[in-house]
Amino acid sequence: MRAFLSRVFWAAVALVIVPGAALLWWANQPLQLPAGANSLDLSIEPGTKPAAIAQAVADAGVGVQPQLLWWWFRLSGQARSLRAGGYEITSGTTPARLTRMIARGEESLRTLGLIDGWNWRQVRQALARSPDLKNDSQTLSDDALMQALGRPGVAPEGQFYPDTYSYAKGSSDLALLRRAMHAMDTHLAAAWAARSPDAVVQTPGQALILASIIEKETGRAQDRAMISSVFNNRLRIGMRLQTDPSVIYGLGAGFDGNLRKVDLLNDTPYNTYTRAGLPPTPIAMPGKAALWAAVQPAQSKALYFVARGDGTSAFSESLDAHNRAVVQYQLRKQPAAK
């Protein structure tokens, strides 16, 4: 009897150990990808159960039995830790490595750069060109989009901070825009808290508008504070800003790259030649330096500036001096190259 019980015991042990050892061996073997594929993308939606995740791995093209992978999720103790997200299964990935990756949320990240000085139309185009983003915003009007981001009634122009953003493949472009919006909030608040007594703008919103103009007008970083000084000085005395980038913005997509006199006379809400004060919204995304320049202008009496042709600007306190600078740098022919 004792011998019989011993055999039963060891048989039971074998029934547990052998399959367990086999599963452990299997979990550390590379997963089979389709011929010629170096990687596969796996998207897991929030709330997906472990069994459905195992099936999603197989559906992505991995040569694996979902039931076996599901058992590994359970026996490894990680079934309840599996996270939603976008993952990349590369050649050589084992079931054990894949499970750890999903449990730790090690998503496959992509990047998208939003460039200083871009307008909202360019941001929309960049989002649409990003195939790894879920384009939830593309069917939304600007009003509906800002409503979805929690800013009803706010125009989207200038509300997003220019930077390089990482995102998981398959994530929503609304999530990326929300991060960019909060980043702009943070940078604008920091600049506003450090504003100079010389700054004329009365609200953070006005500072954002002015910063967007400074961003578009600045050719060299060294001139940024002086350009801000010119605009602050003009606002202080009620002088029109007369800034070309705002006029161009008001012309919209129809602008052909050549700003004509008739354009300067075309009265739009953004024509700072025909209207006093700031335009109604930003005209682009200002970067950090432009935000700070808007609220910390250089101390000067300059009211005019003109491009020298090398990226820098010449500043003047009087119209006569400005006209001479225009003749010197823009109207007079440049000397022939030696």
Model-derived features: where do they sit?
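N-terminal type II signal-anchor transmembrane helix
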Residues: M1-S39
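Bacterial extracytoplasmic/cell-wall-associated proteins, especially those involved in peptidoglycan
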Residues: K49, R129-K134, Q147-K338
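Short low-complexity stretches enriched in small and charged residues
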Residues: V8-A12, S39, A79-S81, W118-R121, ...
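N-terminal start-of-chain detector that recognizes signal peptides
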Residues: A12-I17, A60-G61, A84-G86, D136-L140, ...
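Short alpha-helical segments used as structural interaction elements across diverse proteins
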Residues: A3-F4, P46, L319
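Signal peptide-directed extracytoplasmic domains
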Residues: W25-A191
